[in-house]
Amino acid sequence: MPSGTFLVARSALFFLGACVAVGALAADSPAHFDAKGKLPSTFTLELRNGLKAELPFVDKRDFDEAKKGFIAEPPYKQIMADAGHVAWDMASYQWLLSGQDFASIHPSLQRQAVLNMAYGLYEVVPGRVYQVRGFDLANISFIKGDTGWIVFDPLTAAETARAALELINNTLGERPVVGVVYSHSHVDHWAGVRGVVDEADVASGKVMLIAPAGFMNHAISENIFAGTAMSRRTQWQYATLLERNPFGHVDQAIGKNVANGTVSLIAPNRLISENIEEITLDGVKMVFQDVSDTEAPVEMNTWFP
């Protein structure tokens, strides 16, 4: 037998033997493959109970603050992707609202996960600034101009950003999008842009798309160089591949999860390159402050005088 054939045959036998061994293990130890995994140990429960007693969980002010300005929520809990699958599913987290104290979840994580159940349209500054929350990992903000909306940070997916725009238009009245702002280069703050504007309107100047200088370079390069590693880290850090329940995926701390929809990008037509720059768009005065190399390689704060 040629040596190559021998190696292939030996590898096949080894693989078959491994499969038989794993199959036997699975048959003998079905609990090992329980989707719950191991229940919390006595040590873990004692540690958790100690934290529960030590931290100020009786302070409910954050829950009161999170409810302020609530206007409306949509009649649905799922947002479908253009490809036909579910892009966003708040229904899968409703168990968090049962009021139950889950021994398998760190108490601070459970508290944050409940706070992140905010879902719908909120008024931040009366008559001027609004947010749609709970449609993606980040929040999308809408500033009311003289004639239209200035959209801040259009989420991760075109479908969730589009749904947010539809919600605010259906609730407060139809207005065109006259501007978009990318606050920084992380994907959850720009990849839904094609859900709120058309590229032709940006190219023609009909819509002003504002971003910090160097945005395109860092938005693309960071995901090329570090995207795979960041995705794998997220899967481990937030258990995003597990079922959504007290023994699996619970939350992603700054939001529920990342929307699984259409990732898009439109190049900005107005860059902020100075430390401080001022722009007035549709009657709204905005002062931009460069804060690059803080939370992102390129980033800016925006002040509304």
Model-identified regions with their sequence ranges:
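Solvent-exposed loop/turn segments at secondary-structure junctions
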Residues: 136-139, 156-159, 185-189, 215-218, ...
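N-terminal pre-domain segments of enzymes
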Residues: 27-113
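Metallo-beta-lactamase
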Residues: 123-124, 173, 210, 216-293, ...
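Bacterial N-terminal signal peptides that target proteins for export
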Residues: 1-13
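N-terminal signal peptide c-region/cleavage motif recognized by signal peptidases
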Residues: 19-22, 26
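Low-complexity, highly charged intrinsically disordered N-terminal segments
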Residues: 70, 74-102, 118-119, 225, ...
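Active-site metal-binding motif and surrounding structural segment of the metallo-beta-lactamase
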Residues: 147-148, 158-209
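Conserved beta-strand hairpin/beta-sheet module of binuclear metal-dependent hydrolase folds
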Residues: 114-175, 299-304
